[in-house]
């Protein structure tokens, strides 16, 4: 049985030039490299110094199009996952569309699902392709979380970084088996009863400010390992594969303890778990596409590899995707 798949044909990423180490943070809050490293696995993160979410997205998009061998005019849709847009309106996607020079009529929208945002955006673009409404989409996860972090709060300011990752997906005919190239399965979830556990307290209709990230760290950690593992298991089940078939798992890069916890819960060897939190920090919606692009560019991820993507974020939202590169 033939059916339409969404094949990942281009990858791109962009990081701000400024790097902030744990030792740098120890100069402004009561912390240390040892304290941060042992609790989070983070050593350094990139922090924007004038670069906007739109700037990072644009650069990542250009790289993704180049690796795909495509131009902006080939795109039918741009979807950006972010909680730190340049403006309240219009969307970052529309801004990128204008800068790239896409054709008139290209669908543009942003989505706010926090750290799960890229999985949400990828799922929506994949569904549009599978329904035959579009053929090619640019899916971006991008954040400048440094702009919504309280730099006097050592519990949160040490965690986050800025960056962007982008993927070009394109319709391709498959045979309807797990041997197909492309997105084989996706699954999304949310549970709004945990709304207050991870929140940026600010907004247009409340405070007229952007606010700062606040978090119940213990609650998030407790929920995250189970949610990330559940999403991974479910997409494997949907596609009819087992953990032994999987080449890589790429969890949202929030915290090394969570990442390791997911690997152990799924009984996957450490060498199959992709980790980039050490030099990125938590980049929210950018973490998965950023790691995908870096690892593909480095030759670690190869065509034909079967990869599980899984993420959880504020809301709570969470989700997974199974992709054969």
Model feature map: region roles:
Residues 14, 81-86, 113-118, 141-146, ...:
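Acidic, glycine-rich active-site loops and adjacent beta-strand->loop/helix elements
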Residues 224-229, 243, 247-266:
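Active-site pocket-lining segment
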Residues 130-163:
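Flexible, glycine-rich active-site loops centered on histidine and acidic residues
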Residues 1-50, 153-222, 226, 230, ...:
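Condensing-enzyme catalytic core mediating Claisen C-C bond formation in acyl metabolism
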Residues 35-39, 43-55, 83-137, 264-291:
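Conserved catalytic cysteine-centered active-site region
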Residues 290-310, 316-325:
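Catalytic phosphate/nucleotide-handling subdomain of diverse soluble enzymes
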Residues 8-10, 36, 64, 75-78, ...:
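Buried hydrophobic positions in well-ordered alpha/beta secondary-structure cores of metabolic enzymes
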Residues 30, 60-76, 176, 230-247, ...:
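Phosphate/pyrophosphate-binding loops at sites that engage ATP/ADP/AMP, CoA/4′-phosphopantetheine
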């Amino acid at each position: 049985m033939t059916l339409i798949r969404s094949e990942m044909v281009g990858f791109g990423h962009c990081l701000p030039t400024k790097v902030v180490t744990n030792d740098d943070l120890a100069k402004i809050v009561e912390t240390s490299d040892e304290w941060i490293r042992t609790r989070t696995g983070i050593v350094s993160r990139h922090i924007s110094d004038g670069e906007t979410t739109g700037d990072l997205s644009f650069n990542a998009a250009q790289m993704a199009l180049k690796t795909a061998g495509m131009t902006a005019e080939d795109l039918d849709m741009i979807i950006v996952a972010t909680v730190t847009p340049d403006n309240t309106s219009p969307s970052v996607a529309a801004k990128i569309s204008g800068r790239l020079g896409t054709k008139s009529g290209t669908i543009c929208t942003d989505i706010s699902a926090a750290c799960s945002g890229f999985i949400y955006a990828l799922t929506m673009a994949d569904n549009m392709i599978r329904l035959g409404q579009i053929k090619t989409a640019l899916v971006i996860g991008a954040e400048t979380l440094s702009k919504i972090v309280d730099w006097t709060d050592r519990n949160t300011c040490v965690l986050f970084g800025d960056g962007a990752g982008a993927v070009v997906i394109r319709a391709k005919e498959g045979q309807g088996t797990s041997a197909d190239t492309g997105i084989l399965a996706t699954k999304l979830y949310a549970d709004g009863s945990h709304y207050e556990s991870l929140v940026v307290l600010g907004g247009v209709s409340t405070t007229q400010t952007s606010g700062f990230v606040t978090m119940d760290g213990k609650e998030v950690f407790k929920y995250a390992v189970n949610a990330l593992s559940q999403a991974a298991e479910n997409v494997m089940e949907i596609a009819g594969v087992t953990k032994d078939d999987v080449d890589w798992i790429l969890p949202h890069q929030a915290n090394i303890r969570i990442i390791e916890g997911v690997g152990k819960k799924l009984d996957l060897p450490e060498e199959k778990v992709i980790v980039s939190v050490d030099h990125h920090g938590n980049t929210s919606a950018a973490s998965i596409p950023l790691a995908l692009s870096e690892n593909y560019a480095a030759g670690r991820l190869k065509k034909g590899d079967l990869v599980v993507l899984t993420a959880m974020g504020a809301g709570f939202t969470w989700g997974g995707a199974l992709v054969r590169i």
